[in-house]
A protein has these predicted regions:
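Hydrophobic alpha-helical segments and helix pairs
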Residues: 64-119
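Catalytic cores of soluble, metal-dependent hydrolases
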Residues: 2-61, 65-82, 121-129, 135-250
Length: 250
């Protein structure tokens, strides 16, 4: 599986997992109109920049401010698929401006506009935030609670009955507890080991055609804090990358 690092902030300069020779780096640091909200010009620039790279790959896409890139990657899939999202936030807000895709609303964009998506499953979202999603949208998405995550039969008995097509997985590390990921957004309470266990269950039951991982921590004025954050996230990224590659080659 190809590994593609999409760099908006330079954060991967502090993470050694990204230094492997087999990893392709895409420098997006000079793009405008892409931070958290992506306007039409930013969207066009991103599409042009990312066009040479495959959607069926493992993508690292910087901080959660750029999670909307998942919408772009899955728009490139020309076959029926199910989308599985690990995120402490449902990312189903309505856009504030017409024609703008956002880090907080991209799931709704996929749900309403992608002709190939058959199911959307969100794992680890806050119950409070789930209930804030408009009912007509919430009813079209399957949510997995923390209790269900801990029960290994939950996937085949619930989601497994729905899915009859390949899956694309999107992981925002803010679904993890603070000890396992330092992000720009509020964290959930899933451990890295729990996340890996659920991913293995998915790989055992489904055909995974692409993955992206977001949730890096943006730069601050505190250099030591940046280094500490990068160290925690580097460990998570390294472990997830190695696990995904091992599942892909098995």
């Amino acid at each position: 599986m190809d590994i593609i690092v999409v760099d908006f902030s330079g954060v991967y300069d502090f993470e050694s997992f990204a230094s492997g020779r087999e990893i392709v780096h895409v420098d997006c640091r000079g793009l405008n109109g892409v931070d958290c909200y992506c306007d039409a010009d930013g969207r066009n620039a991103l599409r042009k920049t990312l066009a040479p790279y495959p959607a069926k790959a493992l993508h690292f896409i910087d901080s959660g401010d750029y999670h909307y890139l998942t919408e772009y990657w899955v728009s490139r899939l020309q076959e029926p698929f199910s989308l599985i999202v690990f995120d402490h936030h449902p990312d189903m807000q309505r856009p504030q401006w017409e024609g703008v895709v956002s880090c907080g609303g991209w799931v709704t964009d996929v749900l309403e506009n992608n002709p190939y998506v058959k199911n959307i499953i969100i794992v680890g979202a806050s119950d409070k935030l789930i209930h804030e999603v408009p009912t007509h949208l919430r009813e079209k998405v399957m949510f997995y609670s923390q209790a269900e995550i801990d029960h290994h039969q939950a996937w085949p008995s619930k989601a497994g009955k729905l899915i009859h097509e390949p899956v694309y997985i999107s992981i925002d590390k803010d679904v993890l507890r603070k000890q396992d990921a330092v992000t720009d957004w509020t964290n959930g309470d899933m451990t890295l080991l729990q996340l890996q266990a659920v991913l293995r269950i998915i790989y055992a039951h489904e055909e995974v055609i692409g993955v992206d991982i977001t949730g890096e921590c943006s730069a601050t004025l505190d250099y030591l804090s940046e280094v500490r954050s990068a160290s925690v996230n580097n460990k998570a990224n390294e472990e997830l990358m190695q696990m995904i590659l091992s599942e892909t080659t098995d």
